[in-house]
Curated annotation (Swiss-Prot):
This is Probable peptidoglycan glycosyltransferase FtsW. It is a multi-pass membrane protein. The chain crosses the membrane at residues 16-36, 54-74, 82-102, 110-130, 144-164, 167-187, 188-208, 279-299, 318-338, 344-364. Its EC number is 2.4.99.28. It is an enzyme of class 2 (transferase). It is found in: Cell inner membrane. The gene is ftsW.
């Protein structure tokens, strides 16, 4: 009898989204294995050092995924404020005990692992905002403090991230919160005010940080200074150019031989394009599109069944993955400034992979509960 119940439960999970999730992660493991070889041998005397760690992160993410989808959404909601406070604490202590890499203080080292609290911030803040929109909807729309409270919390997170500095994740937090408020029916003038405030903040940050001005200028014309501010982008474009239509073949990248910095993290799409070509790159982007589409579909179905928390959270995850993909790929191909963001599911990074697996586990759990409710309603007819 228990086995039959398990089979019925498996039937109600979104198998397409799960298949896309696993497929993209396996592709990521393969590309990271190729892109990180020269870095592994130079830094750790092991060709597959980063590949093995990435595989470990995948199994850990997979384990957490299967733990989370077993927990009812209403139980997860109880812990959103505790999770918010813990994440806020980690974002503060990262400045005290964190490791600095390439001038950024984003990682807390615990044994063999490094935690990046800024990655966890996306999941935890969007969970909190989604819960707040549902439980405090009238206050949010009608009272000034009700509107300002989540804005202040979001701005605290954004400021702490900007201090690291982490402009990419700060933008994702800000823009996703803004779009969630718009989706919730918040007054258009309030949303416009938030947007203009964000633009003004970005403008001020660019003016007072010379390296950000150089990034903007190098994005506009990377070939003007190809060996300094434009180096990453020119090397990235060269990698994509070498790939042409069908690519040089898996493992045959030249740019990964330390010509392109961050080849296995932020710029992995360049190596993917070089080795798998235009066709391989498009296939990956199509798969990412369908992941986002399935998540938005779950969000829409949640609203139809009046499961508003699941709806807002699903949309927040879809917006987050959309923005992160656009910013990463846009930076790599030279149509947007480089933000230092990973490509979801593909880039090397334990915190990034674990966080995104956890977020999608909650989305799939939401969808599971919708399907169960629909099935039970059908049986009662």
């Amino acid at each position: 009898m228990n086995n039959k119940k398990k089979i019925v439960k498996i039937f109600f999970y979104d198998k397409i989204l799960f298949f896309l999730l696993i497929s993209l992660s396996i592709i990521g493991i393969i590309i990271v294995s190729s892109a990180s070889i020269s870095f592994g041998i130079r830094l750790h005397n092991d060709y597959f050092y980063f590949a093995k760690r990435n595989l470990l992160y995948f199994f850990l993410s997979f384990f957490l995924f299967f733990q989370i989808i077993r927990i009812p959404i209403n139980q997860l909601e109880k812990y959103n404020k505790i999770a918010l406070l813990i994440n806020l604490f980690l974002l503060i202590i990262v400045f005290i005990i964190g490791n600095s890499i390439n001038g950024a203080i984003r990682w807390i080292k615990i044994g063999f692992f490094s935690i990046q609290p800024s990655e966890c911030s996306k999941l935890i803040l969007f969970f909190y905002i989604s819960d707040y929109i549902v439980k405090k909807n009238k206050e949010l729309k009608n009272k000034l403090w009700g509107f300002l409270k989540p804005i202040i919390i979001m701005l605290i997170f954004v400021i702490l991230l900007l201090m690291q500095p982490d402009l990419g994740n700060s933008l994702i937090l800000f823009l996703t919160t803004l779009l969630l408020f718009f989706l919730a029916g918040i007054n258009l003038w309030k949303c416009c005010f938030m947007f203009l405030f964000g633009l003004l903040t970005i403008f001020i940050l660019i003016i007072f940080k010379p390296y950000r001005i150089r990034r903007i200028l190098s994005f506009l014309d990377p070939w003007e200074d190809p060996f300094n501010s434009g180096y990453q982008l020119t090397q990235s474009l060269m990698a994509l150019g070498r790939g042409k239509i069908i690519g040089t073949g898996l493992g045959n990248s030249i740019q990964k031989l330390e010509y392109l910095p961050e080849a296995y993290t932020d710029f992995i799409f360049s190596i993917l394009g070089e080795e798998l070509g235009y066709i391989g790159s498009i296939i990956i982007l199509i798969m990412l599109f369908f992941v986002i589409f399935r998540i938005f579909l779950i969000g829409k179905n949640s609203f139809i069944q009046k499961k508003f928390f699941s709806g807002y959270f699903s949309f927040s995850v879809g917006i987050w993955i959309s923005l992160q993909t656009i910013m990463n790929v846009g930076g790599v191909i030279g149509i947007l400034p480089i933000k230092g963001l990973t490509l979801p599911f593909i880039s090397y990074g334990g915190s990034s992979l674990i966080t995104i697996f956890s977020a999608i586990a909650i989305v799939i759990r939401s969808d599971f509960e919708l399907r169960i409710n629909k099935y039970q309603a059908y049986l009662k007819q």
